[in-house]
């Protein structure tokens, strides 16, 4: 947004890169939605941590006799889904609540729904998917109990992530329907281009209400000295 310096991600000074986004919950998100948006943000952090734990578990799986392809895919998922999760489903949710944007709500539901399905698949743990889910962990107990115990941790975390994602989808959808959002409104935002940088709720209110104070001269006008009152 104009006039506000990007502050996310908070990069160390020695890295010659600058933050890409401006993020301030108390400044941009209405107070009644701040808790929910923060929870979505923490869910993204938890999912990133889950991918990191899954990478370690896939390494243990590989060392104990599993396929190295799972470790390679786990590394790919960590490098891919960590930034993409922030950009593709957290930022749409953030912008949707910031400016009551139906287009961003729709983007969140579509992408976050796909993320939810993928997380369920990761929790199940099909072989060759690079995810230490329940099937992979339980099936590996016959080969290595130690590695299988390590593999149970990401299975639990993937399950928790999927459960929390389901709760977030229902909560956001309930709020979205309660505010009068619709697919038609999202189409209007798309056709007008306002979805790219939707104004904040405060800016929308100011544009709607305009200047609430009438314009009066700052100094009252009196008759000249010696004049007569009408």
Swiss-Prot record:
Pfam families associated with the record: SCAMP (PF04144)
GO annotation terms (biological process): protein transport
Location within or outside the cell: Membrane
GO cellular component: recycling endosome membrane; trans-Golgi network membrane
Membrane topology: Multi-pass membrane protein
Signal peptide annotation: none
TM region(s), chain numbering: 40-60, 61-81, 105-125, 149-169
Residue ranges, annotated region (Disordered): 208-230
Keyword annotations of the record: Membrane, Phosphoprotein, Protein transport, Transmembrane, Transmembrane helix, Transport
Disulfide pairings: none
Topology Cytoplasmic: residue spans: 1-39, 170-230
Protein name in UniProt: Secretory carrier-associated membrane protein 4
UniProt lineage: Eukaryota, Metazoa, Chordata, Craniata, Vertebrata
């Amino acid at each position: 947004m104009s006039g506000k310096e990007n502050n996310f991600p908070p990069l160390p000074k020695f890295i010659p890169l600058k933050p890409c986004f401006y993020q301030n919950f108390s400044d941009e998100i209405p107070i009644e939605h701040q808790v929910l948006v923060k929870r979505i943000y923490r869910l993204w952090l938890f999912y990133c941590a889950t991918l990191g734990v899954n990478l370690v578990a896939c390494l243990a799986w590989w060392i104990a006799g599993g396929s190295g392809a799972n470790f390679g895919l786990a590394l790919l998922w960590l490098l891919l889904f960590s930034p993409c999760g922030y950009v593709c489903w957290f930022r749409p949710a953030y912008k949707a609540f910031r400016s009551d944007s139906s287009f961003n709500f729709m983007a969140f539901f579509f992408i976050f729904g796909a993320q939810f399905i993928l997380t369920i698949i990761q929790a199940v743990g099909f072989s060759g998917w690079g995810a230490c889910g329940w099937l992979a962990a339980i099936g590996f107990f016959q080969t290595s109990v130690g590695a299988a115990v390590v593999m149970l941790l990401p299975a639990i975390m993937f399950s928790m992530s999927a459960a929390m994602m389901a709760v977030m989808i229902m909560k956001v959808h309930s709020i979205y329907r309660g505010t009068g959002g619709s697919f038609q409104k999202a189409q209007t935002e798309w056709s007008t281009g306002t979805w790219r940088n939707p104004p904040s709720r405060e800016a929308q209110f100011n544009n709607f209400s305009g200047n609430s104070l009438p314009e009066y001269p700052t100094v009252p006008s009196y008759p000249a000295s010696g004049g007569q009152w009408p």
